[in-house]
Design a protein with these regions (language model features):
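H-loop (His-switch) and adjacent beta-strand-loop-beta switch element
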Residues: 222-235
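Conserved catalytic motifs of ABC-family nucleotide-binding domains
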Residues: 170
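Catalytic Walker B motif of ABC-type/P-loop ATPase nucleotide-binding domains
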Residues: 174-178
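ABC ATPase nucleotide-binding domains
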Residues: 246-272
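ABC-family P-loop ATPase nucleotide-binding domains
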Residues: 77, 88-152
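H-loop/switch region of ABC-family ATPase nucleotide-binding domains
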Residues: 209-210
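Conserved structural motif at the start of ABC-family nucleotide-binding domains
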Residues: 6, 20-23
């Protein structure tokens, strides 16, 4: 049996004097597609940074409270080759960061081998890397974008390129952090359909979001976060009830399920 993707045992992450994750204990199994759902400020971003080892939790008695793929000590770059990551923040850094979108799509995908934003001067790019990058773009329906700069693309096109970047190392897990922020309705649907196919092809999904509509039918488990703690963990039908969502988001909601997706409205006024 493979090791769990993530094991946390009373993990606490502090920013300033405030815990953003507070004695968090949970296990995410391999091949169990999981959504982390909660409002802004619930600790979702801190959870991602903990998973990728950008943040380290407080250790009690010299024992690490976190294990990723069964290990508590990782080289960060080696770990990131096992975790493909797509986020709106990464999108913003590629398009509006230091390179101001000048990175070509093929170079952006190749940068996934180095866990960098673009290819560093000392990075050695092999023919095998170029082949795998081209295959990743093809898989995401973005081969025609290879020679274009990211800032010349629509948000949906750029997000597909970043999805190819996340998959170029054949990671064990795809981490999606608020993945459809900034996408219109059509682009969002197309993006999530590609994510569904990735899940069906065998890559474990970890989806971090505050949008219930992003929870694709392949998600088998939902973890509700509130104020840095697990408020509930269970299957989607058990987690996405009006009572549990009100407890986490602080507002009365109506929940409907259609086509395997969940849709919510604020109770009482019909607003989405």
């Amino acid at each position: 049996m493979s090791s769990p993707v993530l094991e946390l045992s009373n993990a606490t992450v502090v920013r300033g004097e405030r815990p953003v994750l507070d004695s968090l204990t949970l296990t995410i199994r391999a091949d169990e597609h999981t959504a982390i759902l909660g409002p802004n400020g619930a600790g979702k971003s801190a959870f991602v940074r903990l998973l990728t080892h950008e943040d380290r939790p407080l250790a009690a008695n010299g024992t690490s409270p976190i294990r990723v793929f069964g290990q508590d000590n990782w080289d960060v770059f080696e770990l990131r080759s096992q975790l493909g990551i797509v986020s709106s923040d990464l999108h913003h850094r590629f398009v509006f960061g230091n390179n101001e979108g000048r990175v070509m799509a093929d170079a952006a995908v190749l940068s996934g081998f180095f866990a960098t934003q673009g290819i560093l001067r000392y990075g050695v790019v092999t023919q095998d890397m170029r082949r795998r990058a081209a295959e990743a773009l093809e898989r995401m329906g973005a081969a025609h974008l290879a020679g274009r700069r990211l800032h010349e693309m629509s948000s949906g096109e750029a997000r597909r390129v970043l999805l190819a970047r996340a998959l170029v190392t054949s990671p064990r897990v795809l981490v999606l952090d608020e993945p459809t922020t900034g996408l219109d309705l059509v682009a969002r649907h197309a993006f999530m359909e590609r994510v569904r196919q990735i899940a069906r092809d065998g890559t474990t999904l970890i989806l971090i979001t505050h949008h219930i509509e992003e929870i694709v039918p392949e998600i088998a488990r939902v973890i509700l976060l509130r104020a840095g703690k697990v408020a509930f963990s269970g299957d989607p039908d058990s987690a996405l009830t009006p009572e549990r969502l009100q407890d986490v988001f602080g507002a009365a909601m109506q929940v409907e399920r259609s086509g395997g997706y969940y849709h919510v409205r604020l109770a009482g006024n019909g607003s989405p």
